[in-house]
């Protein structure tokens, strides 16, 4: 689980390269929500993934080692895919589903593994 405060438009433009790849950014820009909201959601989702997996895999991985592959704003769900093999049970390509909600300026995400 993770909670993040909504990034401003300016901050999102400054930070996106550390959170998402150029291709992932382009995909987020095609979504209906504003980019800063989607980047905050992606940041929080990737933090949730790290918090869920690190106790199992015991190896460091960063934001660019996972990719947001789906966001459903109606159902408030998302899917992340690993781009790096972490362990035999967590190979590249493995997908993780999660949920999110927004309350005021806070975005909360969680993933069950």
Which residues fall in each region the model found?
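Core catalytic alpha/beta fold that binds nucleotide/phospho-ligands
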Residues: 1-113
